[in-house]
Amino acid sequence: MRLPDIVGVELTGRAQPGITATDIVLTLTEFLRKEKVVGAYLEFYGEGASSLTLGDRATISNMAPEYGATAAMFSIDQQTIDYLRLTGREDEQIALVETYAKTAGLWSDSLKNAEYERVLRFDLSSVVRTLAGPSNPHRRLPVADLAERGISGVVENEPGRMPDGAVIIAAITSCTNTSNPRNVIAAGLLARNANRAGLTRKPWVKSSLAPGSKAVSLYLDEAGLTEDLEKLGFGVVAFACTTCNGMSGALDPKIQQEIIDRDLYATAVLSGNRNFDGRIHPYAKQAFLASPPLVVAYAIAGTIRFDIERDVLGQDASGRDIRLKDIWPSDEEIDAMVKSAVKPEQFRKVYAPMFGIQDQRRAAVSPLYDWRPMSTYIRRPPYWEGALAGERTLRGMLPLAVLGDNITTDHLSPSNAILMDSAAGEYLHKMGLPEEDFNSYATHRGDHLTAQRATFANPKLFNEMVKNADGTVQQGSLARVEPEGKVMRMWEAIETYMTRKQPLIIVAGADYGQGSSRDWAAKGVRLAGVEAIVAEGFERIHRTNLIGMGVLPLEFKPGVNRKTLGLDGTESYDVIGERKPRADLTLVIHRRDGQTVQVPVTCRLDTAEEVSIYEAGGVLQRFAQDFLEAESAAGADKKAG
């Protein structure tokens, strides 16, 4: 087992009035990305950490994948105990937690003198109201800088037409933000103030509230804020993954057609964790992350071109101009409402039944699943047959794609709505499904014939092998098949290579595999025939998933990359050397002109266990081997006895 780096993050100061946990975590995400904490365990401490509620701490911890850390932890203190009591835990359990933490040295007072090899410092008082975007959660965008960054500008107000920069989706969503009572209550109070001032949501904005817990609805009802949110269009649509994961549903057809006809720059604003290009909605060209109350404000503004701090949201009954500061609730108002409306019995009502003894026995239908050959949702998987059953030679590999930095799992295998003109859409249409039943890529992950067609299906992809006449990289789900040099849609290229049984490789830049821990981001490339990926760096979760599918992750040495090597996709590749944890291997590049270049790379199988899984062909193959060996040993013992 490779021990992770333990990094101390000292939080100093206190957040300024009006600053939400979302503002803090988006600012921290930018800071920690720059500090390169990928794969590290972070321990937050200091006076700033002590001042944060447990809900605020959880918001910070839940964004760990966005800043690349494996874990983000706060020590146990009185805030922890108060939260356990607030959320309905039994007194005996609360007492046990406190006693155990103090006895085991896990209470915050016991950890004040902890020493770390690496310490980062962050001042909470430096945080300002902020968005993140477009394209990345670590791309912080202070609202005071909207004009300077070229986001806000002249707002078009032509009757009957959407403005450029129209916010077509405004969603209070994600488990990270909606599980924080202060964030949700703040949104409700802002909605109440907006309604009292006579402000309304713009008609082209599709708004929604998708809490991470049913308890949210209970305390919004208790606070009397549900109706205020619903009046602005923020009614509860589900307690599940929705807009965050590209499942906001269809737009009004007239709005969708206007976006297409006028080629509008349409956007989404949501309180989610991720805003990668193409993730939120096919017709939202870009997405911005914001706190729940800011999401409500942007639904009223109706356009990202709006300077949310300075511009006028509307007028009240007396004709007075209303700006954000006029409807933003005070911290004291938020805290008072949380204290009066959020109650332990709400959490007990929601969660206690989950842990109750249920005796609902059902008759056994069949010892084995009855596979349906025409299903597009669940199909017998191919992981022990076909290409995955063959030997990986790591020889003569051709590049499927040459990619830049910050490639996300949404680029590798999007999860949003399936469109008719996509490879998956065409397949589902041939299977007899009407377009309204296509659903999303995520819902078809149990059918490999649909899901593998999502591989690199993101229309925002830039494959550096595919260029325009002027030499710029062409955007789209495209590939160039070698040796012909023919450009085609990515799925057709994959089919071509699969027919030829051609081993493939992917070449990429830094931070490859950011975002959701999406298994199909690894499954898709392996089923396509990809045997290795060489990049400047990998996100931890995706690297692990690649190994689990039998794909070899290789890392360029510092200072070496696709650009310094002049790679253009016409090359073929071999990998030679003994695969050991973090061993130096040799990437042999065969150029079209006959030249051969040998480049040292690091084998990113970081432990002996990862080597074992990779050599078995992946985690499923390893499981099958272990199972068969155990069965064989049990049979031998029985025979001997």
Predicted regions and their residues:
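Structural motif
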Residues: 6-8, 39-43, 70-73, 119-121, ...
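Extended C-terminal subregions enriched in glycine
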Residues: 204-249, 451, 516, 522, ...
